[in-house]
Structure formats: C-alpha cells, structure tokens
Curated annotation (Swiss-Prot):
Heme c 4 binds at residues 282, 285-286, 393. Residues 1-26 form the signal peptide. This is Cytochrome c-552. HAMAP family: Cytochrom_C552. It comes from Salmonella schwarzengrund (strain CVM19633).
Length: 478
C-alpha cells in the first residue's frame, strides 16, 4: 500500500541539481564590513541534524580518483594551452571539494595571495565559506583577486550552508529551508523565468543543485561567475550567447582556435531529459529518503549513484528490475562513449591540421571560418561529455550534441584540406604519438616534472599556512 501511495505521489508530481614562502597569508585578517549569518563549519549542525550530517560525512567514502586524461589522452590535445591539459580527474565525494581544488594541477602553485594562474571564482562551488565571504564582502569583494587569496578563508568542504538557510527558524525546526546561497545563481534562474522564491518544492530541490552543477564562465575584469543562459539553456543558445560577446576561455595552443570550455552542465542536461521534463528532481535520484536505526525517515546526504539505493530511488517510478535498468543505462552510456571517441579523433586531427595550415602561411581571413567550426564542434562535444551523467539525464540530447559536433568537425577538416592544398600540402598531416597522457602532454610542450614538483612544494608549504590561519581566525575547528 505504501509503495502504491508513493508511486501515486510520483505520478502526480510528474504531471504538475619552508623557507621561501612569504608571510602574506598569515597577515590576512577577516573583513567584517557586513553582518554575517552564514556559518560555514558543517559540524556545527551535527547535533541538530545528526542523520543528515553523518550521511553527508560519508561522502568521504567516495575517495577513488579516476584520471580522465590517462583514460583518454586525446583530451590533452583538445585542451592544449589550458590547465585541463595538465590534470583532469572525474568527480568524487563532496567531502573532497576543497582538497581536490587545492591539489589539482590546474590551480597552479601560488606563493603569495596575488600569485597563480586562476581567479577567486574557482572556489565558487567548493565551500559554504564562499557564501560567507559573499555575504561579508559583497560579490565584487569576493570575486576580486587571485584564487590564492581565498586559501586561508575557504576551508570547509561543500556542505550545509551551501544549500540551506541555516540561520533561519525553519532550519532550526528541522525543515529544509532551501536557499540559493550564490546570488549569481539566483539571477540566472530569474533569467530563465524561474525565480527561486516563487518556485515549488520540486523545482527548488533541483535549483539548489543547479547552483554548481551547471555551465558558467568568468565575466568581466573581476572574473565573476555568470551562467550563459540569456538566450536559453540549449547548447546552441549558449553558443550564440558566447559568440555574441566574443568570449573564449582560452586559445588552443596548436590550432590557435578561441575555445570554449564547458564545466559540468548537469542542470542543463537534466532539464533537457525525460526526468527533468517530468520534474523528477536531483534529490529523488541522488538523495532519497531513507530510514535511520529508529525507523525515522530522513534525506540521505551521501549523494551518489541511484542504483546504490534502488528501492528508494528508481523503484519508486520504474517497474523494471535493477538488472534490466542497469542494462539499458549501460547501453546508452556505451553509445555516448563510442560517438564521443569518434568526435575526439576528428578534433585531434583538426587541431594539428590547423597548425599545419598556420605553419604553411595561412592568413587570419583564411583560417577564421575553419576556427569557428572547430570552436563550435568542440563546444558541443564538451557540453555533452562534461556532464558525466548525460547517459542517464538526457541520452538523446547527448547523442544529438555529439552528432552535431561531428558534423562541425567534418566541415572544419574539409575546409582545411582545401586550404592546405592551396599551400601545396596534399598529404595527410601526421600526428605525434599521443597514446598515453604523458606522451600527449609532451607533444604539446608541457614540462610535467616541473609542474608536479612545484605543486608538491605548494602543498607542503603554503596549504599548511592557510589552515593555520583559518584556525587562528576561527574558521576551522581545532
């Protein structure tokens, strides 16, 4: 009877996301320009919400690192000249959010608060300390400066105050008190006609996840986070938006193409799929209601694979058994993967062929339409593959985007063949050996030994200073 009731509820919901280091970090002190109500220390809420806290803490069990570059060295070529060519691991548990952004080679090895390759915005999805700093300094104040400036401040892992208004009476009374703790996310939702304060419970559940599991870019001199949704959320809409403002994340060092790098667009791809269209939320599948030892229901905060809680997730709506659904999902995942690899092969050739054209004396005017095709092809490929769960969220949309990417890449290569022929080059452009991550990185000129050594020195010297300063300022528990 309970299962029938739950299915009925789901049905109706379907109808209606050491010595050389300077002392600059130790000299930083908190700014108290505004009243701050965000408490970033997650353990503060453990006594009040023990089941939720312990299940959130269990995300530390999701500790395995998967090296995406080692698995697929083509990525190194596609991201040549961009920090992702150095290091790209698949995501793991929320408990590692701060650790992973510190340890990734993409954030470099800054020695001072003004040093390093990336802006403050790169902390934005990693910690409730971000919400605290935005409240304390304002958005302009928070985004100002380099990533390293936030080191002594952003120290607590993604947690309670990222998604809940922990200072509210509702939260104190045990209610969800969901909130968009990032103002830029609130503005983005309004841009697509979904103001958070007017949204229903199911919409709010996914919108909270969509603060971070989303495509974004760094806007203006301050490198502030913005979602490119002004024209809509489809891949073509965002492409049109980026083209209109002549935005690029970087220039590929081989082809000289002004590139776009998709982030993790789960909210967009979920919205385009059957679950999103029927308002089956992120929470329904990744954070189901479960029972504690006393039989009390609570929301499981060990965010993970729905198949790990099949009876509480998939079985609420689907009549198929677990093995049958896993087979369907595996087939869709394989189809996405197979087309992904085919697109990557075309793009790898296109980047090296474009380099050959430049080397042969091609002009900007000759290369412009070709680079535009490469840009659009890789953008569509990237938006599909950067959403790791697209085979589950929107497999048809994933295949559509990859098919479009293949067409654009083929257009680029056809134009390149014609252009190269005018330069007297009619033979196939050879590729270097990129059969491993290490060989691919060498092919684009990365000195990985130096990059890794600098990172290890940073982790041994600078990060401990950050943590000491955070404890001194009461931002971390002793």
């Amino acid at each position: 009877m309970a299962r029938k009731t739950l299915r009925a509820r789901r049905f109706f919901s379907l109808i209606f996301p050491f010595f050389f280091i300077t002392s600059v970090y130790a000299e930083q002190t908190p700014v108290s320009a505004k009243t701050v109500t965000v408490e970033a220390k997650n353990e503060t809420f453990a006594p009040q919400h023990p089941d939720q806290y312990q299940s959130w803490k269990a995300t530390s069990e999701q500790s395995a690192r998967e090296d995406a570059l080692a698995e697929d060295p083509r990525l190194v070529i596609l991201w040549a000249g961009y920090p992702f060519s150095r290091d790209y691991n698949k995501p793991r548990g929320h408990a590692y959010a701060v650790t992973d952004v510190r340890e990734t080679l993409r954030t470099g090895a800054p020695k001072t608060a003004e040093d390093g390759p990336l802006p403050m915005a790169c902390w934005s999805c990693k910690s409730p300390d971000v919400a605290r700093l935005i409240q304390q300094e304002g958005e302009d104040g928070y985004f100002h400066g380099k990533w390293a400036r936030g080191g002594p401040e952003i120290v607590n892992d993604l947690g309670c105050a990222d998604c809940h208004n922990t200072a509210s009476d509702d939260f104190a009374q045990g209610k969800p008190a969901l909130t968009l703790s990032r103002p830029y996310a609130e503005r983005a939702m309004e841009a697509i006609g979904k103001p958070f304060d007017k949204a229903g419970r199911f919409d709010q559940q996914s919108m909270v996840c969509g603060q971070c599991h989303v495509e974004y870019y760094f806007d203006g001199k301050n490198k502030a986070v913005k979602f490119p949704w002004d024209e809509g959320m489809k891949v073509e809409n965002m492409e049109q938006y980026y083209d209109a403002i002549a935005f690029s994340d970087w220039t590929n060092s081989l082809s000289k193409t002004p590139m776009l790098k998709a982030q993790h667009p789960e909210y967009e791809t979920w919205s385009a799929g059957i679950h999103g269209k029927n308002n089956v939320t992120c929470i329904d599948c990744h954070m189901p209601k479960v029972q504690n030892a006393e039989g009390k229901l609570y929301t499981d905060h060990k965010i993970g694979n729905p198949f790990d809680n099949f009876a509480q997730t998939c079985a609420n709506c689907h009549t198929q058994d677990k093995a049958s659904l896993q087979k369907v999902v595996a087939e869709r995942k394989q189809a996405i993967h197979d087309l992904k690899i085919k697109v990557e092969d075309q793009l790898v050739h296109a980047h090296f062929e474009a380099k050959a054209a430049w080397d042969a004396g091609a002009t900007d005017a000759e290369m412009k339409p070709i680079l535009n095709d490469i840009r659009h092809a890789q953008w569509r490929w990237d938006l599909a593959i950067a959403s790791h769960g697209i085979h589950m969220h929107a497999p048809e949309e994933g295949l559509r985007m990859l098919g479009s990417a293949m067409d654009k890449a083929a257009d680029a290569r056809t134009k390149l063949a014609r252009l190269l022929a005018t330069k007297g080059i009619t033979h196939e452009i050879p590729l270097p050996d990129i059969s491993t991550k290490e060989k691919a990185q060498k092919a684009i000129g990365l000195n990985m030994q130096q990059i890794n050594a600098e990172k290890q020195d940073f982790l041994k010297t600078v990060v401990p200073q950050w943590e000491d300063q955070a404890r001194k300022n009461g931002l971390l528990s002793q």
